[in-house]
Amino acid sequence: MKRINILDECTFNKIAAGEVVERPFSVVKELVENSIDAEAKNITVEVKNGGQDLIKVSDDGAGIYADDIQKAFLTHATSKILNIDDIFSLNTMGFRGEALPSIASISKILLKSKPLSETSGKEIYMEGGNFISFNDVGMNTGTTIKVTDLFYNVPARLKFLKSSSRESSLISDIIQRLSLANPDIAFKLINNGKTVLNTYGSGNLEDAIRVIYGKKTLENISYFESHSDIISVYGYIGNAELSRGSRNNQSIFVNKRYIKSGLITAAVENAFKSFLTINKFPFFVIFIDIFPEYIDVNVHPTKTEIKFKEDKIVFSFVFKTVHESIKKSLYKEFNEQIKEDVKEDNKEIIKENPSLFQNVEKVQIPIDLKSASMDIERKSLVNSVLCNENNIVKDNINKNIYIDTKENLSENKLKNILKENTEDMVSKLPDMKIIGQFDNTYILAESVKNLYIIDQHAAHEKILFETYRDKIKKDEVKSQLLLQPIVLELDSEDFSYYVDNKELFYKTGFNIEVFGENTINIREVPFIMGKPDINNLFMDIINNIKAMGSGETIEVKYDSIAMLACKSAVKAHDKLSKEEMEALINDLRFAKDPFNCPHGRPTIIKITSLELEKKFKRIQ
């Protein structure tokens, strides 16, 4: 056996530098983050040959005291923390005291700095971690660090560098991310003598987004914001036009620290999934402000990964915040005819005109849209109905509040029902007149100089999905007893997933018993599903749960199961009567998210008369 050797400081620092300094952009990131911690308002970064020949970072921050400059190059010397407990209350980017000694050990470095209280600054020069000179220097308040000949003494590292242009691109990317995180700081990036980025430092995030991504991006993003006692989430998400085949345009910041997080990415993408073009990823810039004690930033050498103390709470909060923002944005974009205050107006009309809800004749239901399993409760008021024009309670906003008096509802009960369903009664789409059906697949309708094309299968899928999902959340799912129970023998992994999610199956309408080792007996299934293939349905649910991972909340799992309820929807090429089409569109109008099916495909397309006139060359 070989003898154990104690490494010398030079060798140790070079090895440690391999973790902190992967490539030139790592140097830029560490130095710029130091400038941010110094409360600089202007930061200039200059690079040559992809950072291999030169990296220069200048700032107007607080500066370093003369007697601290040499200390700054000692391993684990830092002004950010005193003990391990301070890591859990960090408000700075750096804290380990590793950056400067690591960089100095593999390059030639010149640092000069002057705090406001001093009349002159100090300049220190080092090569390969060795002190060469330490002198006085005249300069403005702030710090300038010049790194040259990176990796000159570890030539093996040079072989792993990419081309100069690629390394420059990585540097540009990290400066852009830091600019987004700090819109109150003016950043300038100079690459090979040419200024390639220059932000305003106005404090306005939209200004930074415009400089980095352009005017078109700024015009296609929506703001979101939500707060709780321990966490705040805010930022911007792009519409489908900005979606791309990679995640390059996704930025996540936790307490202003740029990180990569599969948890946050999954939360945003799941929220966007119903509106997302298939196989493309949304643009987003998301900020999460959370008490430092709820995160651990000391889990990765480059500090680009963190751990959340309550990851499921964070996932759920981000998911709900982003999803609600997208939903509101789509309503506004798709249907400008629906006013933002329609909900309040509806309440006032109901309050001021109680006589509207008296002596209303029974509304007939001539069809079930081939989904008799849709057991719609009385209090949903409107779903799957066809109303004779004389039986409709009309108001001057949405003309779509219906009441069936068969049960002789008391006035108090009626008020309670109306109160509970005010949101459901607000139409998300305008009133439409049926034109016909194309190819027994698409419903054609018109409204106020707009042509609407509705995918009947996608629309009915969304209606079934929302109905089933709402019933799950309200514990109102009804089950149907199977004439002959189904016995499934599972492998040990699938059986374990079932046991771990037993409550999930119960709440979604399944009655399942353990029937021996790795074997289950399915006695009841959700009534809304009609007559599905039970074996495949159960395995689909198990596979979905497997794919989700531990970060997904129970609500997302409910949504995933609800998608499987859509198989009883009307299909393409099913011929529908005019009454069936009217009922389907009416249900879609009152859906919570009517624009996309559960799988992300659009349910409805709007073509304006202006677009048609352009197509026919009637106007230019």
From Swiss-Prot:
Keyword field contains DNA repair: yes
Gene name of the record: mutL
Pfam families (alphabetical): DNA_mis_repair, HATPase_c_3, MutL_C
Organism phylogeny: Bacteria, Bacillati, Bacillota, Clostridia, Eubacteriales
PANTHER family: DNA MISMATCH REPAIR PROTEIN MLH, PMS, MUTL, DNA MISMATCH REPAIR PROTEIN MLH1
Keywords for this protein: DNA damage, DNA repair
GO cellular component: mismatch repair complex
Top-rank taxon, per record: Bacteria
Protein family (similarity comment): Belongs to the DNA mismatch repair MutL/HexB family.
Record's function text: This protein is involved in the repair of mismatches in DNA. It is required for dam-dependent methyl-directed DNA mismatch repair. May act as a 'molecular matchmaker', a protein that promotes the formation of a stable complex between two or more DNA-binding proteins in an ATP-dependent manner without itself being part of a final effector complex.
GO biological process: mismatch repair
Entry GO MF terms: ATP binding; ATP hydrolysis activity; ATP-dependent DNA damage sensor activity; mismatched DNA binding
Entry annotated with the keyword Chloroplast: no
Stored NCBIfam families: mutl
SUPFAM superfamilies: ATPase domain of HSP90 chaperone/DNA topoisomerase II/histidine kinase, DNA mismatch repair protein MutL, Ribosomal protein S5 domain 2-like
Organism of this sequence: Clostridium tetani (strain Massachusetts / E88)
UniProt-listed CDD domains: HATPase_MutL-MLH-PMS-like, MutL_Trans
Name of this chain's protein: DNA mismatch repair protein MutL
